[in-house]
């Protein structure tokens, strides 16, 4: 798996992820870019799960964003509906965090759309570790969104064997 973190703070939104790809109990690659920009660089997307499946979902997400002129909520609803109802897509094993200037969501293959709680979202095998660390940092420090996401990923990477310390961090002004 992996760890993806999204943090919103002080007019910034950050989506960050580690770079480890695993095959069973073996590390296949250590520098996979699991966080990308879509729709004219206005939407950040991070994935956890199967890399091949995630690329299919990135493409589908881009098409839904274009169809809805960049309206992330509408695009996410349509993506979740199609992902859940299409026989081939239903078999995809991945989760997405998507964020733009105003909205952060988790999209899952079961059709779930989850809004950010306390300006924080995490997915992947190290998600609970990263969430705990980021929550503590949000509540007890003045660190910015980028620093919180990076520190949370580092802590998750120290604990979770499926998360490494090779981070990709993308940021938008919110």
Swiss-Prot record:
Q: Which InterPro entries match?
A: ATP-dep_Prtase_HsIV_su, Ntn_hydrolases_N, Proteasome_sua/b, Proteasome_suB-type
Subcellular location per UniProt equals: Cytoplasm
Its predominant location is cytoplasm
Reactions catalysed according to its record: ATP-dependent cleavage of peptide bonds with broad specificity
Q: Which UniProt keywords apply?
A: Allosteric enzyme, Cytoplasm, Hydrolase, Metal-binding, Protease, Sodium, Stress response, Threonine protease
Q: Which superkingdom?
A: Bacteria
Bilayer-spanning residue ranges:
none
Q: Does the keyword Metal-binding apply?
A: yes
**Activity regulation annotation text:** Allosterically activated by HslU binding.
Q: What class of enzyme is it?
A: hydrolase
- Where, by residue number, does Na(+) bind? 157, 160, 163
Instruction: List the EC numbers from the record.
Output: 3.4.25.2
Matches recorded under SUPFAM superfamilies: N-terminal nucleophile aminohydrolases (Ntn hydrolases) (SSF56235)
Q: Does the keyword Hydrolase apply?
A: yes
**What is a single molecular function from GO for this protein?**
threonine-type endopeptidase activity
**Which cellular component terms (GO) are annotated to the entry?**
HslUV protease complex; proteasome core complex
GO BP term, pick one: proteolysis involved in protein catabolic process
Q: List the active site.
A: 2
PROSITE patterns recorded = PROTEASOME_BETA_2
Q: Which family does it belong to?
A: Belongs to the peptidase T1B family. HslV subfamily.
Give the quaternary structure. A double ring-shaped homohexamer of HslV is capped on each side by a ring-shaped HslU homohexamer. The assembly of the HslU/HslV complex is dependent on binding of ATP.
Function according to Swiss-Prot or TrEMBL: Protease subunit of a proteasome-like degradation complex believed to be a general protein degrading machinery.
Q: State the name under which the record lists this protein.
A: ATP-dependent protease subunit HslV
Organism from which the protein derives: Aliivibrio fischeri (strain MJ11)
- From the UniProt record, report the name of the gene that encodes this protein: hslV
């Amino acid at each position: 798996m992996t760890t993806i973190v999204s943090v919103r703070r002080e007019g910034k939104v950050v989506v960050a992820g580690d770079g480890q790809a695993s095959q069973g109990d073996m590390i296949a690659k250590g520098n996979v870019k699991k966080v990308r920009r879509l729709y004219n660089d206005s939407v950040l997307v991070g994935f956890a799960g199967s890399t091949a499946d995630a690329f299919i979902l990135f493409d589908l997400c881009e098409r839904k964003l274009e169809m809805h002129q960049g309206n992330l909520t509408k695009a996410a609803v349509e993506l979740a509906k199609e992902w859940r109802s299409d026989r081939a897509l239903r078999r995809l094993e991945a989760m997405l965090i998507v964020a733009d200037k105003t909205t952060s969501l988790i999209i899952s293959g079961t059709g779930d759309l989850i809004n950010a709680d306390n300006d924080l979202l995490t997915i992947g095998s190290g998600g609970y570790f990263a969430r705990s660390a980021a929550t503590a940092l949000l509540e007890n420090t003045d660190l910015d969104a980028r620093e919180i996401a990076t520190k949370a990923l580092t802590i998750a990477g120290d604990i979770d064997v499926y998360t490494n310390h090779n981070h990709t961090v993308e940021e938008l002004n919110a």
